[in-house]
Amino acid sequence: MQSLQDNITSRLEAVDGEGRFVEDLWEREEGGGGRSRILTEGRVFERAGIGFSEVHGSHLPPSILQQRPEAEGHPFYVTGTSMVLHPRNPYVPTVHLNYRYFEAGPVWWFGGGADLTPYYGFVEDAAHFHATLKAACDAHDPEYYPRFKKWCDEYFYLKHRQEPRGVGGIFFDYVQGDWEKIFAFAQSCGNAFLPAYLPIVERRHTLPYAERERNFQLYRRGRYVEFNLVWDRGTIFGLQTNGRIESILMSMPPLVRWEYNYRPEPGTAEAELYEVFLVPQDWASQAKR
């Protein structure tokens, strides 16, 4: 988990060219700690947060026990790396990654995934992101990608808005079995992130944009905030275990706006986001061979 954080940190600094990550080491009173790294006001990334944590305690919170009641009464150990990148250019999508490992007495599992949230959609980008993650999944089990892609579509869904957060990716949780094989799978998925995302950044970060595109980006960032504060399991877990609030909320965008009863104009790129890209579909099959 720490090497994943290290690799992504160094590559993102190279891509940004100006911004540098500031590291903040922290300890949790109940046990464990972590290292948060944040880049702000970079050339490419307006904010980029990459966190590693390794915490332990006497009992798991209700949000976990609802899913794994057999873990009740056992001390727990959790480690993981999470990341959210908020680019400056509205044509570059926001991206999220999280991979984690839980252990509570005799119970253990892996979870995580990565998903893409564009503001202005490009089929080429969505297809590339999904195809890269699919290849990482297929190397371990051809049933993984369709299963975890569907899970991602269902998980990153704003029920109160009745719309997906973005074009998805993969998501899995409470996965058990052969420890070594599942660990290797999670490792492959983590290593697939940079080749899945950086080509998109390189294609889009120099595209010209104006106030209209910036305002729409800030408006759509509001959906990110809503999901993270209302539905996200990681946020809920952190709050229920007395996690470090600065690290928990590091994923928030630096600027955001809400509009009352916003409706995109028909025939615009903004409308296309809703009509095409916020509709779950088989993106991987649309990748160029």
Curated annotation (Swiss-Prot):
The family assignment reads: Belongs to the aerobic coproporphyrinogen-III oxidase family.
Which UniProt keywords are given for this protein, alphabetically ordered? Chlorophyll biosynthesis, Cytoplasm, Heme biosynthesis, Metal-binding, Oxidoreductase, Porphyrin biosynthesis
- Class of this enzyme: oxidoreductase
Question: Which reaction does this chain catalyze?
Answer: coproporphyrinogen III + O2 + 2 H(+) = protoporphyrinogen IX + 2 CO2 + 2 H2O
Q: Where does substrate bind?
A: 82, 98-100
Gene3D superfamilies from the entry? Coproporphyrinogen III oxidase, aerobic (3.40.1500.10)
Tell where it localizes.
Cytoplasm
Q: Note the site residues: Important for dimerization.
A: 160
Q: Does the keyword Cytoplasm apply?
A: yes
Q: Give me the Gene Ontology terms describing cellular component.
A: cytoplasm
Stated EC number for the protein is: 1.3.3.3
One BP term from GO: chlorophyll biosynthetic process
Name its co-factor(s): a divalent metal cation
Q: What is this protein called?
A: Oxygen-dependent coproporphyrinogen-III oxidase
Described function = Involved in the heme and chlorophyll biosynthesis. Catalyzes the aerobic oxidative decarboxylation of propionate groups of rings A and B of coproporphyrinogen-III to yield the vinyl groups in protoporphyrinogen-IX.
Task: Name the segments for region: Important for dimerization.
Answer: 224-259
**Subunit-level organization:** Homodimer.
Its source organism is Gloeobacter violaceus (strain ATCC 29082 / PCC 7421)
What's one GO MF term for it?
protein homodimerization activity
Residue numbers binding a divalent metal cation:
86, 96, 130, 160
Which HAMAP family does the entry mention? Coprogen_oxidas
Q: Out of the domains of life, which is the source?
A: Bacteria
